[in-house]
Amino acid sequence: MATIESRLVEMLTVPVEALGFELWGIEFVHAGRHSIVRVFIDSEKGIFIEDCAETSRQVSAVLDVEDPITTEYTLEVSSPGVDRPLFTAAQYQAYIGEDAKVQLTMPVAGSRNLKGVISKVEGQILTLNVDGKDLIIALDNIRKGNIIAKF
């Protein structure tokens, strides 16, 4: 069965791309009777507040028609930001050599929260170097992944 995130990605990719943006990813946070749908958009020129507002209107219209979410929800549209979340193998691949943190569904090396350097991505397998040791992580075991911003 497809996750709500994957159904939303399938539903919203074309409308977001029609506006000239890339659908970077979607987070669905279910909190009791109220949920949050976070839609991340990106573009080579960057994302401005007007872009988020325009995308929010378009996404809201699609969600109103398709009605994939049965609970009350808040829609948030933003850029991925400097600590951008990572959703796909291609996104992890693009950030090889960068520091990242991942929250896992099942522990790896005794931990569900890891910080390290993205070493390699092969298919749906991520290699994360944590304290000098390469850890192999299946992408479907990652609940949440983010780049660690360097300042």
From Swiss-Prot:
Main location: cytoplasm
UniProt cross-references to SUPFAM superfamilies, sorted A to Z: YhbC-like, C-terminal domain, YhbC-like, N-terminal domain
InterPro entries per the UniProt record, alphabetical: Ribosome_maturation_RimP, RimP_C, RimP_C_sf, RimP_N, RimP_N_sf
Keyword Cytoplasm: yes
UniProt-annotated location(s): Cytoplasm
Keywords per UniProt: Cytoplasm, Ribosome biogenesis
GO BP: any one term: translation
GO cellular component: cytosol
Short name of one Pfam family: RimP_N
Function recorded in the entry: Required for maturation of 30S ribosomal subunits.
Family membership: Belongs to the RimP family.
Protein name: Ribosome maturation factor RimP
Organism: Shewanella denitrificans (strain OS217 / ATCC BAA-1090 / DSM 15013)
